[in-house]
C-alpha cells in the first residue's frame, strides 16, 4: 500500500477520526461510571445488604474500560499515522482484551435491571430495618446502613416503606418485633414533619389520619435511579462497542495492506 496515495490518506483520516471518537467515548464512559459509583442518591447500602452489588462492579469495569479506550485510541492513531504494523498489532491485542471486559460490563449492567424488584427491597427492609440482633458484625454493619438509608429516604422524599405504610402492618418485621403496634404502627419518619423535623401530630400520624402521614411508597425513588444508571452503563457501553467494532475492522484491513 503506497503511503502517498490520496485514497490511502483518506482512509487513514477516516480511521483516525474513528479512533478520536473512541477516545472521546472512553472519557465519557469513565465520567458516567464515576458519577454512578459516587452514589449520588446514597442507595449503595441497600444493594450491599442484598449481597448482589454487581451493577457497581459493572460500573467499576466501565471506568477501567473508558480509560483504556482513550489510551488505546491514541496508540491506534500513532500506529495509523506511522503505518507501523507492530504498533497496530499491539493495539489489536490490547483492544480485544478491553473489548471483552466492556462486553462483560454491559451484559452485567443490562441484566441487573430485572433484579431491582419491590419484593427484593421489601424483604430486606423487613429483615434489616432497626434489627439490633444480628448474628455477626457484618450483618450489624448492613443493618445500620439499611436503617440509616431508609430513615433518610422516608424523611427526605416524604414516602413510607416500599409500597406504602401498610408494609409495616401487613408483614412480620424486625421493626414490628422491637416496637409496640399501637405506639409505632410505622416508623416516625413516615409522619409529616414540621420545620424542626418533628412529627406535625404524632397521635394523628399513629391513627393514620390523612395529611399527617405519608401514603406513598419509596420503591420508585429507589429503583428509578438504579435503573437509569444500569441502562446508562449498559446501552452507552453497547453503543461504544458497536462503533469500536467497525473502527477495529477498518484498522485491521488497513494493517493487512501495510507493506513489510
UniProtKB/Swiss-Prot annotation:
It is found in: Membrane. CDD domains: uroplakin_I_like_LEL. The chain crosses the membrane at residues 13-38, 61-81, 87-107, 230-250. It comes from the Eukaryota. One of its GO terms (biological process) is epithelial cell differentiation. Induction: Down-regulated by TGF-beta and serum in quiescent cells. Rapidly and transiently induced by TGF-beta in actively growing cells. Its main location: membrane. It holds the Pfam family Tetraspanin. Residues 39-60, 108-229 are extracellular. Keywords: Membrane, Transmembrane, Transmembrane helix. It is a multi-pass membrane protein. InterPro entries: Tetraspanin/Peripherin, Tetraspanin_EC2_sf. Belongs to the tetraspanin (TM4SF) family. Heterodimer with uroplakin-3A (UPK3A) or uroplakin-3B (UPK3B). This is Uroplakin-1b. It comes from Neovison vison. The lineage of its organism: Eukaryota, Metazoa, Chordata, Craniata, Vertebrata.
Amino acid at each position: 500500500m503506497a503511503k502517498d496515495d490520496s485514497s490511502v490518506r483518506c482512509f487513514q483520516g477516516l480511521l483516525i477520526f474513528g479512533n478520536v471518537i473512541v477516545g472521546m467515548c472512553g472519557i465519557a464512559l469513565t465520567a458516567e461510571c464515576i458519577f454512578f459509583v459516587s452514589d449520588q442518591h446514597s442507595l449503595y447500602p441497600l444493594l450491599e445488604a442484598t449481597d448482589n452489588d454487581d451493577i457497581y462492579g459493572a460500573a467499576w469495569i466501565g471506568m477501567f474500560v473508558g480509560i483504556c479506550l482513550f489510551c488505546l485510541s491514541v496508540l491506534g492513531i500513532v500506529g495509523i499515522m506511522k503505518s507501523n504494523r507492530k504498533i497496530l498489532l499491539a493495539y489489536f491485542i490490547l483492544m480485544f482484551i478491553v473489548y471483552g471486559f466492556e462486553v462483560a460490563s454491559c451484559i452485567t449492567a443490562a441484566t441487573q435491571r430485572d433484579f431491582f424488584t419491590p419484593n427484593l427491597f421489601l424483604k430486606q427492609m423487613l429483615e434489616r430495618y432497626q434489627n439490633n440482633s444480628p448474628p455477626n458484625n457484618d450483618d450489624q454493619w448492613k443493618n445500620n446502613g439499611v436503617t440509616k438509608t431508609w430513615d433518610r429516604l422516608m424523611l427526605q422524599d416524604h414516602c413510607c416503606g416500599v409500597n406504602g405504610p401498610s408494609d409495616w402492618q401487613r408483614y412480620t418485621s424486625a421493626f414490628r418485633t422491637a416496637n409496640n403496634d399501637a405506639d409505632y404502627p410505622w416508623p416516625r419518619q413516615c409522619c409529616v414533619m414540621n420545620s424542626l423535623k418533628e412529627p406535625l401530630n404524632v397521635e394523628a400520624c399513629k391513627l393514620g389520619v390523612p395529611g399527617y402521614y405519608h401514603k406513598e411508597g419509596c420503591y420508585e425513588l429507589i429503583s428509578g435511579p438504579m435503573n437509569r444508571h444500569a441502562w446508562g452503563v449498559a446501552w452507552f457501553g453497547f453503543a461504544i462497542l458497536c462503533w469500536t467494532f467497525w473502527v477495529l475492522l477498518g484498522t485491521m484491513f488497513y494493517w493487512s495492506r501495510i507493506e513489510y
